[in-house]
């Protein structure tokens, strides 16, 4: 079990990292038990690279856990996507980018741990008439601004610049205040400053 080295103003996050440093294997077991060994009852979503679960940590903090899909022989189906997400999220930090807490790279249970977004994905909200009504034009404008700020940070403030390559309503998550957070960095690319860069489309179409 590994963690992202970062400073957080929230004491509970610091406590989480302290537990991770002290006994990562024990914390890994707690996460697996917390989601009932990746039971479908704890599932809150699924994507091309993994299945998302919700669980509560020993300190009482609720987190989201993305378990990577496995191939028929039990190995991780897309190791490249797994490494890409870890590499990207350990190099960036922004209020409009999902916060990354850590990961497990055991063969049978490879997963990533993130902050939990109470409102879920923008796509799910827009697909629900009742929830969509809560998104007035000011809220929607703030969502767009949040995504734009995250992309501007990745493109202009990171060195080398980072290209997400799969911005969609499914990868924009909203917290309890409807603040936008960009997620899913499995297809990102770091641009080389000393050469021409050509980046193909990846991920969601539409």
Regions found by a protein language model. Give the residues of each.
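Conserved eukaryotic protein kinase-like
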Residues: 1-206
């Amino acid at each position: 079990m590994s963690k992202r080295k970062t400073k957080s103003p929230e004491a509970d996050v610091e406590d989480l990292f302290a537990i991770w440093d002290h006994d990562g294997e024990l914390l890994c077991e707690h996460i697996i038990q917390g989601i009932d060994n990746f039971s479908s009852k704890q599932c809150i979503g699924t994507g091309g690279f993994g299945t998302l679960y919700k669980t509560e940590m020993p300190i009482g903090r609720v987190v989201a856990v993305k378990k990577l899909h496995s191939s028929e022989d039990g190995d991780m189906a897309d190791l490249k996507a797994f490494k890409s997400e870890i590499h990207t999220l350990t190099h960036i930090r922004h209020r409009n980018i999902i916060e990354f807490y850590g990961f497990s790279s055991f063969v049978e249970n490879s997963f990533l741990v993130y902050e939990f977004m109470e409102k879920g994905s923008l796509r799910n909200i827009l697909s629900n008439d009742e929830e969509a009504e809560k998104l007035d034009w000011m809220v929607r404008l703030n969502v767009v601004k949040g995504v734009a700020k995250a992309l501007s940070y990745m493109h202009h403030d990171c060195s080398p610049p980072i290209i997400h390559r799969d911005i969609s309503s499914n990868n924009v998550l909203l917290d309890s205040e409807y603040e936008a957070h960009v997620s899913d960095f499995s297809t990102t690319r770091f641009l080389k400053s000393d050469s021409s860069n050509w980046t193909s489309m990846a991920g969601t179409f539409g």
